[in-house]
């Protein structure tokens, strides 16, 4: 949530956009700067992420933050929002990029080909992170994995070849991709872990 908050705050400071967040609970209160920000809380302002997302679309946002993709309805609503031109940020509890893609796809029993096509079309990037203990045991440091949605990745998703994402990720350094293993090695070289 700290990483997403930093992304939203960067947009808020640099761009004149309408940002709507859906959170459970609201963890960080934003003050509108260049952007106009509206924050909605599940349980207080809306019954669920899925219902809140459908309502948010009527508010004409440019950017939507979804606190968590918990269920099929929320995932479907987030994909629809992205398809209609909204920049959607969301969290999903998985261990890696391949797991994130598979979790989204596995949420749907029927219409999986449609979901693969939707996801392949709208996905921009996946950033996975885990917190590792720092050397000396004081504090933690984030270890990242970054998967960028290139045409080749979109094809893997569309064709149902998600088992090849991990090996594809290792070849994507030129496009800005990073595996957790590569980043962990960098953290060790810096003496952080």
What do the predicted segments below correspond to?
Residues 1-193:
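Short, flexible helix-loop junctions that flank or precede catalytic/ligand sites
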